[in-house]
Design a protein with these regions (language model features):
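Generic detector of short, locally flexible boundary/turn motifs and exposed helical patches
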Residues: 17-22, 45-53, 61-63, 149-155, ...
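Glycine-rich portal/gate segments that line the openings of hydrophobic small-molecule binding cavities
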Residues: 107-110, 114-176
Length: 235
């Protein structure tokens, strides 16, 4: 067997990087790549924000509207949840709720950078909305309005968990024409070391598993970012 053949059959390819007088493994390079991607996205969102971004995405947004209206019609007023939970050390649920209310108590984030940068797929806050977002949901670019939900339909409120007594936010998500298509139910409870947090988005029951699973991951990225923002604000 030749040396080349032996190398090819010896197992997976790994890479070490030698630079700046040090050696780095691939996990470090992955982190550098992630940081670079975040910088690139931040630059793009800054340069092509607002109505410019809305115009660029218009066709995709219209397709997203049609997708969600079809889900609503197929669901007949029934729902299912996407749910992600967090165990937080060093920040109480009460402090997180105070921060969240100060930022989004009206349904509109006060610090737009914290909203846009919480997730790579937060494309733009529609400039004519008092609160809202264009983001990827179910593989579709989705434009929605956010408003505080003072009252919840009984099938939605049934998802609230009384063992999490601290409310972060209850919100209604509506399509551009005012059609309700989802609800946010975000709760927490204090622990001896910090908090336990559970965040839910309640979707029409016809939402496919891939959409629910994708949004569970979306919530993990988004709320980890906001938990870190809240912790930084309390220091």
């Amino acid at each position: 067997m030749s040396i080349n053949a032996a190398v090819r059959s010896s197992g997976p390819v790994t890479v070490e990087v030698h630079t700046m007088g040090r050696t780095f493994d691939e996990s470090t390079v992955d982190q550098w790549e992630l940081e670079a991607a975040r910088r690139a996205l931040k630059n793009l969102k800054t340069v092509a924000g607002g109505q410019v971004m809305m115009d660029l995405l218009a066709g995709h947004i219209d397709a997203g509207d049609r997708f969600h209206k079809e889900l609503i019609e197929a669901s007949g007023g029934t729902y299912r949840e996407s749910r992600t939970a967090f165990t937080v050390s060093g920040l109480s649920g009460t402090d997180l709720a105070d921060w969240f209310r100060s930022q989004a108590g009206t349904g509109r984030f006060q610090d737009k950078a914290l909203l846009l940068n919480a997730h790579p797929e937060h494309y733009v806050e529609p400039p004519n909305y008092t609160g809202g977002m264009v983001e990827t949901i179910g593989g579709h670019l989705t434009r929605f309005k956010v408003s505080v939900a003072r009252e919840l339909p009984p099938p939605v409120s049934a998802y609230l968990d009384a063992s999490y007594p601290v409310t972060l936010m209850n919100a209604l998500l509506s399509l551009d024409d005012g059609t309700p298509f989802a609800y946010c139910l975000h709760q927490a409870r204090d622990t001896g070391t910090g908090a336990e947090v559970v965040v839910r988005v309640i979707y029409p029951s016809a939402a496919p598993d891939s959409m629910i699973e994708g949004h569970c991951r979306h919530l993990a990225i988004e709320f980890r970012s906001w938990i870190r923002n809240a912790a930084a604000a309390t220091r």
